Every structure is written in C-alpha cells, then in structure tokens.
C-alpha cells in the first residue's frame, strides 16, 4: 500500500505547478501544504490508478485512505476523497464509523469534509441506519464542530427523501454556535430544501429564530412574500 501511495505522489509531483502553491495554500488559510496540482490533472492521475484501487477489499481500501491522509500534501489527500466518492458505496461496512470519524476530524477543512459528509456519510446513514444512529449520537455529543457540520449537511443529496424533522433537530441543537462553518451549514442545508419545500424553510427560519448568515443562506432561493 505504501508503494501505491508513493507512486501516486510521484505522479502528482510530475505535473505540479510550483507557481500555484502559494495561491492554493492561501485559499485554504495555510492549513495545508500543496504541490500545486489542479483538479484536472489530479483526476487524470486518479483515473490511471482507479482500476487497481477498485480491486481493494474494504480493509485495504481504508488502509489506502489512511495512508493518503497521513501524507504531507493535500493533493494526495484529495486522491483519497476521489476514491471515496468513486467507490465507497461498494465497500461500505457497518463498522465504518471509526474510520469516517477519523477522516472527518483530522486534516479537516470544508474542502474535504463537505464531500465526505454529503456523499460517504450520506450513504452510510441510509445503508446502515442503526449504526448511524449510534454514530450520530456520538458526533452530537462531541465538541468537534466539524462533526456537527457533518450532521447538518449529510442529507444534502437526499432531496425529497430528506428527514426534515431530523434536520430541524440538528439546526435547533447547533444554532447557538456562532462558528462560521456551523451557521453556513445551517443555511446551506435549508437552502437545498427550499428548492422543493420553501414554505417549510420559512417556517423553520421563524421557529428557530435564525439570523445573519444562516438566515440569508436559507432564504436565498425563497421568493419574498
């Protein structure tokens, strides 16, 4: 597995653009080190390794993801996310809670969390509802706000299948946290629902007395009365 990750890193290094590093790192608030590889070339590299990666068993899949996550370069971590998005539905297991928690709470920023939350966690929650209920309780009780953001946005892809009662519960639970990424997530989750249930969104905004960023984002697509 180490050789595979090394091979991927070497492939990324061959297409890196050092002139982009400063801009890419600044965009992520200098939280991560970048090689300077844009998404297009990175995805081409992933495609070259995709066939090999898709043959991995569940335990080996997580081993690969963990090794990518331990790499110093963000683009290697992005490859792990590319892999999750492409294949998680095929290797998902009811015991994945610990691994998902690790990915969501380490090397964390919106660029990684939002994709994992809305795709991988969203799938885990529907495929293993009993296990997710236990996991969600742990996340709710955690002091890690990124896990709270995950609970707020994991239903983004559900559309009309969104559990509205559950969404409002999490909004009510976390709305007092003025952290930007929480308020943004509240508004984002409601904005998605407003595309098909705008009156419900208006009701929630009033009932929960949402203000500022959360309110603006929630009502972005809702016609004014």
Where do the language-model regions lie?
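Alpha-helical scaffold domains
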Residues: 1-225
């Amino acid at each position: 597995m180490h050789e595979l990750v090394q091979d991927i890193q070497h492939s990324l290094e061959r297409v890196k653009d050092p002139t982009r590093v400063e801009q890419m790192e600044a965009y992520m608030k200098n939280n991560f080190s970048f090689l300077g590889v844009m998404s297009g070339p990175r995805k081409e590299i992933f495609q070259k390794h995709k066939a090999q990666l898709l043959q991995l068993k569940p335990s080996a899949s997580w081993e690969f993801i963990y090794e990518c996550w331990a790499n110093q370069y963000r683009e290697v971590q992005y490859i792990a996310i590319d892999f999750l998005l492409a294949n998680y539905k095929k290797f998902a297991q009811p015991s994945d809670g610990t691994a998902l928690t690790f990915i969501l709470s380490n090397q964390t920023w919106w660029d990684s969390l939002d994709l994992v939350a809305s795709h991988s966690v969203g799938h885990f929650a529907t495929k293993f509802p009993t296990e997710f209920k236990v996991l969600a309780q742990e996340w709710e009780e955690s002091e890690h706000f990124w896990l709270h953001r995950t609970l707020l946005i994991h239903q983004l892809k559900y559309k009309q299948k969104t559990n509205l009662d559950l969404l409002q519960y999490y909004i009510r639970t976390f709305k007092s946290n003025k952290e930007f990424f929480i308020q943004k997530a509240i508004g984002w989750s409601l904005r998605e629902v407003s595309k098909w249930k705008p009156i419900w969104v208006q009701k929630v905004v009033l009932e929960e007395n949402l203000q500022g960023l959360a309110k603006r984002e929630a009502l972005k697509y809702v016609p004014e009365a």
